[in-house]
Amino acid sequence: MQVHASLGRTHNPANVQRAVESVRSSGIPALNLDLIYGAVGETLDDWRYTVQQAVELSPTHVSAYGLTVEPGTPLALEPHRHPDDDDQADKYIIVDDILRSAGLANYEISNWAIPGFECRHNLLYWRQGDYTGFGCAAHSHADGRRWWNVRTPERYIEAVDTNSPTEASGETLDVATRKREALELSLRTSDGVPVGALDPKTLDGLVEVVGERIVLTQRGRLLGNEVSLRLLP
């Protein structure tokens, strides 16, 4: 509860339990839990207990993300509350070990699932599929072009009411950018990339060859940003 309060969250574990019971009683077979780690004041034991409690709810899918500080937020103005990289790395290893032991496979850096319950929505992003976003600030992608809608509900509603474009801006990706992004996104997943798509020596210790694929090691998953930087031309 103390960690929740530090992040401005008003829900509590009892709310989570009630929500899960509601999903189960409705006959919905798939259940995802979103977890965030790295808040100041959260010990390794606190985090381990959180993950163990999550496993006891028998989710079919878990997303676990390290806390990030966005510019312009109240947290950004308090550097002493910013997450510590080493602490986040330790907590990633904890969640990875516990979820794998519970039968949830890591199929993308921050996502674990019972086989067959991987998130198709997210897989579409990682495979550079096409999608259309509706609503304020929603993003879309088609044929190598990305665009996003106006940010505020008021502007979006006004645009719809006046039959005006809802798009705020966009960009068309060149061939080189699309290829690099395809490589980066594929490497985030457990499928990795085909042998020959890159030289493993450029990512020494961050990737390994498994059969005919090159996949991230656990260290590579911890250093995803470093992997992306090394793939830059």
Model-derived features with residue positions:
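A short, conserved structural fragment
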Residues: 204-212
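C-terminal scaffold of the Radical SAM
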Residues: 1-196
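Minor-groove-contacting beta-hairpin "wing" of winged helix-turn-helix DNA-binding domains
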Residues: 213-217
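Short, amphipathic alpha-helical interaction segments positioned at domain boundaries
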Residues: 219-233
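Short amphipathic alpha-helical interaction segments
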Residues: 195-205
